[in-house]
A protein has these predicted regions:
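Catalytic alpha/beta active-site cores
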Residues: 1-168
Length: 168
């Protein structure tokens, strides 16, 4: 440790003034803990296992990609990782627009009313179902994932309710 760290840090650690966390891994390339830049990976795409993953076209797919990112990060580090669900919020509106288009096409094909109140009610019902399924996917995936080092990912997932604008 003395070769890699300044002498005063080593001394403070040895005297118990500070604690140098994970000093046993310090010299290795592997690192501890990540604040995942989920927003960038979802909005601009990312590469997982040498495969380009484009920006998701729905909330559910964004949730699935999120769990894949968590699995990859967990398999290449030790320690925890953190992300916020607010980065998934823009995909709720993407799904809302996609579902609205589908509902209008279905109702038009069946000769049903395109009254905004009816269309909105159907859209919001389907959207609520997709959001529930997406979050359930994250939950199930995180609970059942096993990394290449034989551990379940250590994840902190923030769910601040006031973090995104109303309606997202």
């Amino acid at each position: 440790m003395r070769v890699l760290l300044p002498e005063d840090i080593v001394k403070a650690h040895e005297e118990g003034i500070i604690h140098f966390h994970d000093s046993d891994y310090f010299a290795q390339k592997e690192h501890n803990c990540d604040l995942i830049n989920l927003e960038d990976m979802l909005q601009n795409g990312t590469v997982i296992s040498e495969t380009m993953i484009e920006k998701p076209h729905s909330f559910f797919t964004a949730c699935n990609v999120t769990t894949q990112i968590v699995a990859q990060v967990a398999s290449n580090q030790y320690g925890g990782q953190t992300f916020t669900l607010s980065h998934l919020a823009p995909f709720v509106d993407i799904s809302r627009k996609k579902i609205r288009k589908q509902v209008i096409e279905e109702r038009t094909a069946c000769g049903d009313s395109l009254d905004d109140r009816i269309v909105n009610k159907v859209v919001e019902s389907r959207l609520r179902s997709e959001v529930k399924s997406g979050i359930q996917t994250i939950q199930y995936q995180l609970i059942t994932l096993m990394t290449c080092n034989g551990q379940a990912p250590f994840v902190t997932m923030f769910m601040y309710l006031d973090e995104v604008p109303e309606g997202q």
